[in-house]
C-alpha cells in the first residue's frame, strides 16, 4: 500500500479514527509521504520471563517442575520518514508452565541441566503508545489500553544453570528457544512474527 492509498482510506472512512487529533496528524503524515510506499519497520525486544517454580526430583538425574511465570513483551514500529507514525506496544503476561529436566552436572554450588516443556500464557494488561511526528517534530501522542482475550500455548527447550542457595532453594537462568502457537488475536509481537525464537528465563526453583 502507498501513502496516497492510505490517505484515500482516511478521507473515506474517518469514523474508523475516533481520535480527531490522531486523525488530523495521520492526514498530515500521509500528505508528507505522498508517492512513497507504506513500509513498516518493527524492532522486537528480547522477551524476558521471570518464574517461580516447584521442582520434584523423580530420580538421581531427572526432575519435573511446575511454575508461575511472568513475561514482558515490547516492540516499537515506525512508518514514514521525516514525517512518521511511531507505535510502541507493551504487553504483560502471566503463565503456567510444566517442565521435565535432566541434570547434566552437579556440584555443591551449581547445577547444569537441560529442560523442556510447555506453557499456557494469558495477557493481563497491555498498552499501545503512539507518536505522530511531522517534519521531525512530535505534534501529538496517545496511549490506549489493549485487551487480548485468547490464551497462548507454547513449547520450549533450554539449557540451564542453577545456583544452589541451599539444598531446597536455587536461583536459575535458562537461555533457550520456544515455539508459540497462534492465538487468534491481532496483536503484533515477536511471538507472531517469529513463532520460533530465542528467549531468556530467570527464576527461582524450590526443590523437594
What spans do the regions from the language model cover?
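Outer-membrane beta-barrel biogenesis signature
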Residues: 1-18, 111
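Residues on the lipid-exposed face of transmembrane beta-strands in outer-membrane beta-barrel proteins
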Residues: 50-56, 66-70, 96-102, 116-120, ...
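Repeated loop/turn-to-beta-strand initiation elements of outer-membrane beta-barrel proteins
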Residues: 61-64, 108-110, 167-171
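Transmembrane beta-barrel architecture of outer-membrane proteins
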Residues: 45-49, 91-97, 111-113, 152-156, ...
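Predominantly the C-terminal beta-signal and adjacent terminal strand-loop region
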Residues: 148-154, 162-208
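Transmembrane beta-barrel domains of bacterial outer-membrane proteins
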Residues: 1-9, 47-59, 75, 99, ...
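Extracellular/periplasm-exposed beta-strand and loop segments of Gram-negative cell-envelope proteins
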Residues: 10-16, 21-43, 73-93, 123-152, ...
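Transmembrane beta-strands of outer-membrane beta-barrel pores
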Residues: 1-5, 70-74, 104, 118-124, ...
Amino acid at each position: 500500500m502507498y501513502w496516497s492509498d492510505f490517505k484515500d482510506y482516511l478521507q473515506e472512512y474517518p469514523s474508523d479514527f475516533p481520535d480527531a487529533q490522531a486523525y488530523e496528524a495521520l492526514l498530515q503524515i500521509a500528505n508528507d509521504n505522498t508517492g512513497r510506499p507504506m513500509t513498516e519497520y518493527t524492532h522486537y525486544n528480547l522477551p524476558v520471563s521471570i518464574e517461580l517454580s516447584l521442582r520434584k526430583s523423580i530420580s538421581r538425574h531427572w526432575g519435573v517442575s511446575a511454575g508461575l511465570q511472568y513475561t514482558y513483551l515490547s516492540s516499537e514500529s515506525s512508518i514514514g520518514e521525516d514525517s512518521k507514525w511511531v507505535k510502541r506496544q507493551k504487553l504483560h503476561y502471566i503463565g503456567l508452565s510444566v517442565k521435565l529436566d535432566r541434570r547434566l552436572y552437579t556440584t555443591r554450588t551449581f547445577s547444569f541441566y537441560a529442560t523442556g516443556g510447555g506453557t499456557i500464557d494469558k495477557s493481563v494488561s497491555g498498552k499501545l503508545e503512539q507518536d505522530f511526528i511531522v517534519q521531525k517534530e512530535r505534534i501529538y501522542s496517545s496511549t490506549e489500553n489493549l485487551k487480548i482475550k485468547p490464551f497462548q500455548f507454547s513449547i520450549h527447550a533450554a539449557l540451564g544453570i542453577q545456583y544452589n542457595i541451599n539444598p531446597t532453594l536455587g536461583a536459575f537462568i535458562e537461555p533457550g528457544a520456544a515455539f508459540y502457537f497462534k492465538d487468534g488475536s491481532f496483536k503484533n509481537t515477536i511471538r507472531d512474527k517469529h513463532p520460533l525464537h530465542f528467549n531468556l528465563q530467570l527464576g527461582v526453583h524450590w526443590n523437594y
